[in-house]
């Protein structure tokens, strides 16, 4: 309303200026001043389109567990309190890199959109890193599910390295300040990447109930494309859920990317086969594995020439006219000069380099002409007997099966070795890997609340700071230049079709333009036919009138030159009827 009122004022003042143009100069100046004031008021009332729209502010508050947890840390205290740096050395490694001397810090992300939100940061590159913390109490695999969740942000991307966690097995020998790569763990979970191989590990160590030996069991690879989680430099939430019924789920950003069952979807399988191949069994010497054999009764045909060449000279070819038989194809370069440092005793007699014979350029060829070769129609090659089914074929030999002496059946692989600590034991060629909001719990609701209060705020802050749709399209095109072609076609094609549609319409003929009347309109052809009929009818009427007038004249002359009043009245009426008949309003209606 305010904008409309200001526009009305501008119109009124503009009218006043025009009316006062012939008036006093002082009045004109006053009106112009008023107009300038109104224009300034309109400009001031316009919104500032240059300033970017303010993003909704997201206030950070450290998450607090809403129930019982085995472990939780948001690092918002700003210290490594509760975490222990390893002092161990890695075995079978050069002393220069054997130490776990990688640096860890607690700090905010480099481009944090949540002031006050801190995390654990792997600071150095090309070093071994190891840090761990005790759980509030050991986790026992009984009737409750296990849920492990934490956040990772590859702030500088990732070349080669991991961001996985290890749940360290509860053993009497567990010493966190000596945590290293061979420290026993129960579960390893999290992202890992080297080259173009993007992984999301879920590995658990299963104890053989017969031998007591532990063996790693790897979950199947996720079907989802994991590359974006490593390259987009955003914070991602990784969740592992293990249930007492042996089912598992792996989630990224609260969406399932992998799921399965510990009994069916691990490699190698938890339970070995009931039977195995007998390692002592040997294939018999007379075992025939050949499905086809040469026909022993086949005989080489008498006319089979094994010595015939595959190619023969073309006898029908003729030497092209102008062929220079006496000219060599290459000649010494006449412009070449012997190098000054050429030593004939050491280098031998100097010879000019060969160049293409210039006389051959205008000829079909030079040198001795030879007939071209063609395929020999009589060539058959080495004769071989045809193959037939082997009547003695016994199939592919396999050793016999015997009962597996190491067979066992564990129907509850969920009941793994209890663990009492969480650790990060990593090697990375990229620094500034950000970890945050670790939680280990048995209640999904508590974990979801923790995620909403931590990762959920990060996601909201990132969404508030993200560019609009156009900005996101431009960013995507910068990463994938071929998208520019898609954008151009998407915009240009509809415009082209609209222009083509608007410019290619057929022009209507004048015969199809209707008159502004409610009366039925004739088609062009019918209208022309009616005009011809009316013209012929008019000519006949004129001819009849002329004859009538001549007859009346002659009658009048016979009657003494007098004309009756009745005849005088009939004449104007006939003329009026003729005019009415020629009027378009009295035409016949168009025939359907």
Curated annotation (Swiss-Prot):
The modification Phosphoserine is found at residues 554, 564, 583. It comes from the Eukaryota. Residues 326-359 are annotated as: Interaction with PPIB. Phosphorylated at Ser-564 by MAPK3/ERK1. Phosphorylation by MAPK3/ERK1 increases its association with ribosomes. Palmitoylation by DHHC6 leads to the preferential localization to the perinuclear rough ER. It mediates the association of calnexin with the ribosome-translocon complex (RTC) which is required for efficient folding of glycosylated proteins. Residues 274-319 have a biased composition (Basic and acidic residues). Calcium-binding protein that interacts with newly synthesized monoglucosylated glycoproteins in the endoplasmic reticulum. It may act in assisting protein assembly and/or in the retention within the ER of unassembled protein subunits. It seems to play a major role in the quality control apparatus of the ER by the retention of incorrectly folded proteins. Associated with partial T-cell antigen receptor complexes that escape the ER of immature thymocytes, it may function as a signaling complex regulating thymocyte maturation. This is Calnexin. It comes from Homo sapiens.
